[in-house]
């Protein structure tokens, strides 16, 4: 057997007991979850903006970012619901590179999963406390969900995970919205199959237990662009793409049809500055069609304190060490633009 069992890690309950959620933050999450849920059920017309760094690598910078976001939120909260993007696990195309704070709490040092789980929990709690906002993260590892299940208000399933059965089954047990991204091929049927699976009840094995879920009616789609056989980006945020998704939804027995559009990744061709133009086009499409207006519940934007990206070890505070992001000034202006659109 080629596995080396290095050490047993604390269970989610043990980590939660060590770093508990205060009663005040529990109430905050309850209220935020209810408000966000109503967007997906059609009871709330506010527009969702999931915004933040490509990867949350530094607690101080992330907490400064969400503190700034909280100040903007006070001015736009009648029109928008801002959800900080605090991504603590990063899928890597080749398996190499920085995989997030859970793997490496210090990007310049080796893997330390024990300290990584603690760092993830502490950062999410700190960000929630200083901003009054509950966050979004990507569920890269389904078995790790329990470490943050009482903190997150939104979860994304990535393009490389969306076809995986365990991801779909675990999402079916969530009580928060879960966005299922289209795969890198762009196949909408794969994404919609994933949504369908997540909305159903399932029995399965999870963390050594036989479990059964009730299904998640808040599972929905995320359009993030695709890649063709030549490796070129194919965007899927245009009016005709949104119309096609709407038609595909109508062909299926799915509840709460909804879409979030990811303005970066293959929609922008990884040209981060294009996110501003893309978001504006999405808002224009919503104005042109009541059906698209009802389908597109929000956007996802990669943004940090400083624009662009840097190599690990350059130590530029608030600048991404993974994909390039919008800087704060452009982000703030874009958020006010979105509020004016609503």
Question: Each predicted region: which residue ranges?
Answer:
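Active-site-facing alpha/beta catalytic cores
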Residues: 66, 79-244, 265-270, 275-281, ...
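Acidic (Asp/Glu)-rich catalytic clusters
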Residues: 40-43, 70-77, 125-130, 213, ...
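N- or domain-start disorder-to-order transition segments that initiate the globular core
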Residues: 1-41
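Conserved phosphate/anionic-ligand binding catalytic regions in large, soluble enzymes, centered on
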Residues: 48-61, 323
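Internal helix-turn-beta structural module
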Residues: 304-342
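Short acidic, Gly/Ser-rich segments with clustered Asp/Glu that frequently serve as metal-coordination loops
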Residues: 54-57, 256, 264-270
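N-terminal beta-rich core of secreted/periplasmic extracellular enzymes
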Residues: 25-39, 72-83, 89, 120
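Conserved, mostly hydrophobic/aromatic
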Residues: 52, 261, 327
């Amino acid at each position: 057997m080629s596995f080396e069992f290095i050490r047993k890690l604390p269970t989610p309950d043990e980590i939660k007991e060590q770093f508990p959620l205060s009663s005040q933050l529990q109430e905050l999450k309850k209220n935020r979850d209810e408000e966000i849920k109503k967007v997906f059920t059609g009871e709330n017309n506010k527009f969702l903006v999931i915004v933040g760094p490509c990867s949350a690598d530094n607690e101080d910078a992330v907490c400064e970012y969400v503190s700034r976001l909280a100040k903007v939120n006070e001015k736009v909260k009648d029109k928008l619901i801002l959800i900080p993007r605090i991504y603590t696990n990063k899928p890597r195309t080749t398996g190499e590179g920085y995989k997030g704070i859970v793997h490496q709490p210090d990007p310049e040092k080796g893997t330390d999963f024990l300290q990584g789980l603690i760092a993830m929990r502490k950062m999410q709690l700190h960000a929630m406390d200083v901003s009054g906002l509950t966050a979004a993260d990507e569920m890269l590892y389904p078995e790790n969900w329990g470490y943050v299940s009482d903190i997150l208000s939104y979860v994304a399933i990535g393009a490389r995970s969306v076809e995986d059965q365990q991801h779909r089954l675990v999402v079916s047990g969530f009580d928060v919205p879960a966005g299922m991204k289209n795969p890198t091929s762009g196949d909408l049927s794969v994404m919609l199959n994933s949504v369908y699976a997540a909305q159903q009840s399932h029995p399965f094995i999870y963390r050594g237990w036989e479990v059964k879920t009730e299904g998640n009616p808040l599972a929905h789609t995320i359009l993030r662009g695709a890649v063709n056989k030549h490796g070129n980006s194919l965007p899927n945020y245009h009016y005709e793409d949104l119309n096609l998704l709407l038609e595909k939804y109508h062909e299926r027995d799915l509840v709460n049809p909804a879409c979030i559009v990811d303005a970066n990744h293959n929609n922008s061709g990884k040209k981060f500055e294009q996110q501003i133009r893309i978001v504006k086009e999405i808002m224009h499409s919503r104005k042109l069609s009541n059906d698209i207006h009802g389908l597109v519940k929000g956007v996802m934007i990669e943004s940090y304190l400083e624009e662009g990206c840097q190599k690990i070890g350059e130590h530029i505070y608030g600048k991404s060490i993974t994909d390039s992001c919008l800087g704060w000034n452009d982000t703030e202006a874009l958020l006010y633009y979105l509020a004016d659109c609503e």
